[in-house]
Structure formats: C-alpha cells, structure tokens
C-alpha cells in the first residue's frame, strides 16, 4: 500500500487540470510546447505517454542503450525533451516527465561514471510516485571523457552546471504545466549522482529540500588518482607483484575468517568494516606448497597490504582512504586486473593533461598532485561547510554500501567526519539535517550479499514504507519532520520475494548481533 502521505492531494486530483480525464491530459501535453518560452531552451518534443505503452526513448543514443532502455509506463505522463544551451561551445540534453498523478513534488535524477546518459530507470521510478521528474545527459552523451578534450565548458557542465541549470529549467516547466506549481523539491542519485547531490548541497543549497545521495564520488579528483594507483600497486599480470583472481578469492575468505564474527554473527557479511583490520601473513605460501593459487608470496602479501592502505601524497598528506575489506571479489576485476581503470584514465587524458595519448602506465604521485591542484570547477565536491543547506532547512540522507568495489565506503565516512569537524558539530547536532547510513552487504549502488535493497531505485524496490525506501524516507523527513533512525534493507530472492530484512544503523553507530533469533531476524540486531 502506498504510504499515506504520498497520496495527499490525490483525492481531489480529478478536479485539477493536471489529472483530469486522459483526453484532456493528452491535449494539455500535446499543446504544452506552445507555452515554453525559456531563455536558452530549445524544445525538441512534447509527447503524451499513456498507461501501458512503451516509453519513447527516441533521443537516447546507442552508446547509452538506445531504445532498448525503454520500459512500459505504469502511469500517464507528458514527456518533454529539450536542449539547453550553456555557452557557445556547450549544451545539455534533458527530459522532464510530468505525470497525471502529480503530488506537488519535483525531483531531479543524477548520472553515473563520466556519463553522459539520462538515468531513465530513476526517472521511471520517481515518476510513478507522482514526482515531476527531470534527468539530463550532464553535458554530453556517452560514458567517456573524450568530450572533455579541449572543452572546459563541457567539463563545467559535468561538474555542476547541467544539474543546476536543468533543475532551474525543470522547476520552471513544472510551474508552467501544473497550476499549483510544486511544494517541495528532491534529488535522487548514486555514484557520480551522489557527488552531484553533494555538489548541489554545497554550491546551490536552495535547489533541493531533500537529497538522497548514495555512494558519492566526492573527493572526485583524488578518487580518480586512487583508481590509477592500483595499477602501480599490482603491476601487470605475470609480474611478481600481481595477485590473481583465484588468490583474491583466498584473500576474501581470509578476511571473512578474521572479520565476519566481529559483529557477533557468522553470516558472510561484515557489518562494520572499521573493525576489520586483517593480517595477510596468514596466507603466506610455505616451502612445500604445491597449489599456490590459495596462498601468497611475500611480495604479493605486500601488494594486498598496500591495496588496503590509504593513499598519501608526495608531501605525506592524506589524499584518499583505503579500500574497505569485503569488496575484493568484485574489485579484483575492476581495479586489480592489471589493466588500469577507464574512468581514471579518461580523466587524466582528457582533463588533467588534455592529451589523448597520455598512458596510465606512467602514473605517479606527482600526477596526483597535478590533478589535485587543478580540480576544475571544484569538481572534487569535498567542501565540509554545508551551513547554507542547513540554514535553508534542507535534509540529506547519505548511504554507502560496505561492499562497494568502485568507491570505498570509507570515503563517505571521511566526508561525514570532515563536515563534523568543519562545522564543529556533534553527530546528534548533524542529525537535524544530515544522516549517513553505511549499508552492509551492498555493492556499488546495488545489492550485494546482504539485505541491501533499500528502495533507491526500481531494481531495489522492497515496499513503500519509509523504513524500507530511502526515497519515501526523505519525503517523510522533509514534509513530516520524521527523520530516519535506521534504513531497513531487504535481501531479495531470485523470484522477487524477501528472504530477510536487516536494519542498517545511522553512523557512527554500528550493528551488533545480540540474538536470540537467527541472524536473519531483524530484531536480533541492535545499533550500538
């Protein structure tokens, strides 16, 4: 059942122009383009999308999935496609979806990686809840940094401008389409989308009343350097420093052996990675070992230790935290494969050095220093002073998976502490507007081994109750003043049913198994 406060206004919706009969709504949509006269905005189309039809994706290029990204609409809405000019050398594409079941709420989605691609899945998810929803391509199409080459205007769009300008345009369209305008504005994004959410909080604190920021790529420039650093640590396949995927599996099993029970339950999930400080000398191969796929040489053990160590600059200053243990199975194919990391490579090629011939094999800490000094348009998004957002009455729900193999969850904890130190606030004082939830058993923005479906998107839907759904939780916090004390995640089975649930604690508290039920019993855990 849809949470009751989401239905405010729907009882009288039939009396409004936005949700009258299908025929009148269709006519309203088809003629809407005649009302749009916004500076630097070019309307490409306005399309009526009825219930049960394929959602048109005519402007989605093949590099972003093309028409294959389409899905069936569960509601009727008006799909508005536009190009927005940001300079004489740059523009971004955006869509606004204006539903007939409008609840008076506006929402912007974010992006991922270095793209370049409208988050249609998130738009579908938000629009079905009655949000007037927008998404942009963040200044370029495609999941590559090549469009940044020789074009700082495109970099500026990617850093902050496309999201902010798209939000301004989207709000204007919402006011034009619905006589009642909007009551509250929200943001939903993960990874790069998480960084965009934080950048908005830091630079444009009035843009959103509520922000859901997952696994944010904050401290972005150093994150790119961190991604480059792993090749320097592991070396190429076949080198004495390289650790094979089979050996990483042995490392993972050893990490679980040392750390799984620290939370009181042996369930294959690490609840608090801060407590996990594994020692890898236990995996050293002895002189008689025949099968060396499950043990490490001394050199390889040093490689593993370096992987799980923080990155420091040439001057000895901290740049980026360690990779949290528990992510190594997936990370061995992403960062530890000996082939470099595409997004890091692209950032250095097309932004730092503006040289498409730059090679990742030459990377050193001197390059990290050059990148950090550049930080175009403050894309790092690591400003610890978010007092503007606090004063504006904004609320932010920040989550991060503890099995994230792309952006270490230690980065989110580091930022939380940075905000606390910068603003001189205790956790209880931060609670009024900023709450962080580390999610055990969650990978990068998506489920992993544990109860990690928290309603951050259609693929992780586990109910409409705010305790099970971070989007509904931020709405309840903004509109009812009821802040989430925990986020309840669901472990989904292959048939879509729920195997078990677990409540994920608000940082800096940690989850502890206290019994007496099984570890699958959510009431057998306590935040301490």
Curated annotation (Swiss-Prot):
Residue positions of the active site: 191, 404, 444
Enzyme Commission number(s) from the entry: 3.1.1.73
Molecular function, one GO term: carboxylic ester hydrolase activity
Keyword Calcium appears in the UniProt entry: yes
Glycosylated residues in this chain: 83, 101, 286, 354, 385
Keyword RNA-binding recorded: no
Disulphide linkage map: 29-78, 64-117, 190-445, 259-276, 285-295, 505-527
Cellular component terms per the entry's GO annotation: extracellular region
Gene3D superfamilies: alpha/beta hydrolase
Membership in a protein family: Belongs to the tannase family.
Protein's UniProt name: Probable feruloyl esterase B-1
């Amino acid at each position: 059942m849809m949470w009751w406060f989401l239905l405010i206004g729907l009882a009288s919706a039939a009396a409004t122009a936005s949700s009258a009969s299908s025929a009148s709504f269709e006519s309203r949509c088809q003629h809407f383009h005649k009302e749009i006269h916004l500076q630097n905005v070019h309307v490409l189309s306005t399309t009526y999308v009825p219930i049960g039809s394929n959602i048109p994706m005519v402007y989605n290029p093949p590099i972003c999935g093309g028409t294959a990204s389409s899905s069936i609409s569960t509601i009727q809405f008006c799909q508005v496609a536009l190009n927005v000019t940001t300079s004489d050398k740059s523009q971004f594409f955006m869509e606004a979806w204006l539903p007939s079941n409008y609840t008076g709420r506006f929402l912007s989605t974010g992006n991922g990686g270095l793209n370049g691609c409208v988050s249609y899945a998130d738009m579908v998810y938000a629009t079905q809840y009655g949000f007037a929803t927008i998404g942009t391509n963040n200044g370029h199409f495609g999941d590559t940094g090549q469009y940044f080459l020789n074009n700082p205007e495109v970099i500026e769009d990617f850093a902050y401008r496309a999201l902010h300008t798209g939000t301004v345009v989207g709000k204007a369209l919402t006011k034009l389409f619905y006589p009642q305008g909007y009551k509250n504005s929200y943001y939903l994004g993960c990874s790069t989308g998480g960084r965009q959410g934080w950048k908005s909080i830091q630079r444009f604190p009035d843009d959103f009343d509520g922000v859901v920021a997952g696994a944010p790529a904050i401290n972005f420039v150093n994150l790119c350097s961190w991604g480059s650093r792993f090749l320097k640590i592991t070396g190429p396949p076949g080198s004495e420093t390289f650790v094979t995927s089979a050996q990483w599996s042995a490392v993972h099993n050893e990490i679980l052996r040392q750390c799984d029970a620290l939370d009181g339950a042996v369930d294959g999930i690490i609840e608090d990675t801060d407590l996990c400080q594994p020692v890898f000398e236990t995996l050293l191969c002895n002189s008689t070992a025949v099968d060396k796929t499950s043990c490490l040489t001394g050199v390889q053990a040093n490689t593993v230790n370096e992987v799980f160590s923080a990155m420091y600059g040439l001057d000895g200053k901290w740049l980026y935290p360690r990779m949290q243990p528990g992510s190594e199975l997936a990370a061995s194919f992403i960062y530890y494969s000996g082939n470099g990391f595409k997004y890091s490579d692209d950032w250095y090629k097309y932004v730092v050095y503006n040289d498409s011939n730059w090679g990742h094999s030459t990377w050193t800490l001197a390059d990290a220093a050059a990148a950090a000094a550049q930080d175009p348009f403050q894309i790092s998004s690591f400003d610890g002073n978010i007092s503007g957002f606090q004063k504006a009455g904004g609320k932010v729900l920040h989550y991060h998976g503890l099995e994230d193999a792309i952006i270490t969850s230690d980065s989110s904890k580091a930022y939380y502490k940075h905000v606390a130190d910068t603003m001189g606030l205790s956790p209880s004082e931060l609670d009024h507007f900023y709450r962080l939830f580390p999610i055990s058993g969650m990978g990068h923005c998506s489920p992993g081994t544990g109860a990690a479906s928290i309603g951050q998107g259609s693929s992780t839907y586990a109910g409409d109750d705010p305790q099970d759904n971070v989007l509904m939780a931020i709405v309840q916090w903004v509109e009812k003043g009821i802040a989430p004390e925990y986020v309840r995640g669901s472990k989904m089975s292959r048939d879509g049913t729920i195997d078990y649930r677990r409540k994920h604690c608000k940082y800096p508290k940690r989850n502890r198994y206290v019994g007496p039920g099984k570890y699958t019993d959510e009431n057998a855990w306590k935040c301490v």
